[in-house]
Amino acid sequence: MTQSLYQRLGSAEGIAAIVDDAVDRHAANQLLAPRFSGRDLPRAKQMATLFMCMGAGGPQKYDGRDMRTVHAGMNISEQELIATIDDFVAAMQEQGVGATEVNEVVAILYSLKGEVLRV
């Protein structure tokens, strides 16, 4: 039986480690840091972990706001989206995630483009 992306990322624990690292990178990223200043980072990490777990095929239920609502009024640029994805790639590589899984996550994140850019 083929493992789900959720399982291949290390289930909830592995995904939480990826998200924790990625959000820390966002907060330190010169381009993204202003977006994270003053935010409740532990809450952002929790919600992003649930979202990513569900999106990767895990049993968790994300009951937060949809991506368009979360990003409404932020006027996020494509450059910021790419920087966000780059931070996730670096976090996954740091966690030892394989190239196939990294590519799958990148495709999922990029598929959200219409929900987060310039909304």
Predicted segments, located by residue:
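Core of compact, soluble alpha-helical bundle domains
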Residues: 1-119
